[in-house]
Amino acid sequence: MGDNLLTMLGFLNLNKPGGWTSHDCVAKIRRLLKIKRVGHGGTLDPAATGVLPIAVGKATRLLPFLPEKKAYQARIRLGVTTNTDDLQGEILQIGSANHLTLEQIDPLLRQFIGEIEQIPPAFSAISQGGKRLYELARKGELVTPPSRIVHVEKINILDWYPGEHPELELEIICGGGTYIRSIARDLGNLLGVGGTLANLIRTQSCGLELSKSLTLADLETQQHQGNLPLIFPQLALKHLLTISLSAPEARRWCQGQSIVIINSIKLPQSQSVQVVGENGDFLGIGEIATVNISDDREQTLIPKVVLS
């Protein structure tokens, strides 16, 4: 491998297999690359498949700055309720829903678009009192997590499968923290028949697309060939404005000093930006602050994450 393992830095676009937890995938890649510093962005349920962004090396510090938008292909089964809000759990209620039509369902989907209040599943990775909710639930301690506001940008109907327990296939584009299992449950409740998630594929996450993802077997093969397909930070963070520093400025900034910058337009306060050196090398993430009230174009670039 051309990259030194000790200085490896970047992201991998993993197609998570079904039956694996997100942590299982991280552990596998740690063993594969023989490094400890590996993390992931956006937990996927074990039964789900699709895009799982993997951060390698110091790129783990950049995970909070990746784009939040996610896209899913979800299949919802109606007439069935489970304790996990998917088919992996215990069935709590089951009944015929063969009277439902797409014409009945379509208008209800609008209630799930925009800023919506959502209660996460009782079986989830949310922490409460230092414990994951799924850990408590497995011990019989079912805790209803507090509701929270999430953003759903779009819901498109992909297919409809009528029957005793009809299934609805949707494309859902949303922000971080949105539980598709909760949408399945709540849609079923609105229809009065119950609902649960039958299948979930994440097609986009943190700017990475399923069409360009690689399986664990693909990654293992490419790693052995010395061709690990790392996505460099500049590309993964292309949604952020880039600010270039001169060599003296870069040295000071990397030592933790703020740098005064003059912009033709005022940048938003606290905006995160990519910071690069004059040769284009990625230095880290900075934050914009305004200090000169008389000239709001004069701002400072505060070190947020320094990688150089």
UniProtKB/Swiss-Prot annotation:
Keywords: Isomerase, tRNA processing. It comes from the Bacteria. It is an enzyme of class 5 (isomerase). It catalyses: uridine(55) in tRNA = pseudouridine(55) in tRNA. The keyword Isomerase applies. Disulfide bonds: none annotated. GO terms for biological process: mRNA pseudouridine synthesis; tRNA pseudouridine synthesis. Its EC number is 5.4.99.25. Pfam families: TruB-C_2 (PF09157), TruB_C_2 (PF16198), TruB_N (PF01509). InterPro entries: PsdUridine_synth_cat_dom_sf (IPR020103), PsdUridine_synth_N (IPR002501), PUA_sf (IPR036974), tRNA_psdUridine_synth_TruB (IPR014780), tRNA_sdUridine_synth_fam1_C (IPR015240), TruB_C (IPR032819). GO terms for molecular function: RNA binding; tRNA pseudouridine(55) synthase activity. Transmembrane segments: none annotated. CDD domains: PseudoU_synth_EcTruB. The keyword Transferase does not apply. The active site is at 45 (nucleophile). Belongs to the pseudouridine synthase TruB family. Type 1 subfamily. Responsible for synthesis of pseudouridine from uracil-55 in the psi GC loop of transfer RNAs. This is tRNA pseudouridine synthase B. It comes from Gloeothece citriformis (strain PCC 7424) (Cyanothece sp. (strain PCC 7424)).
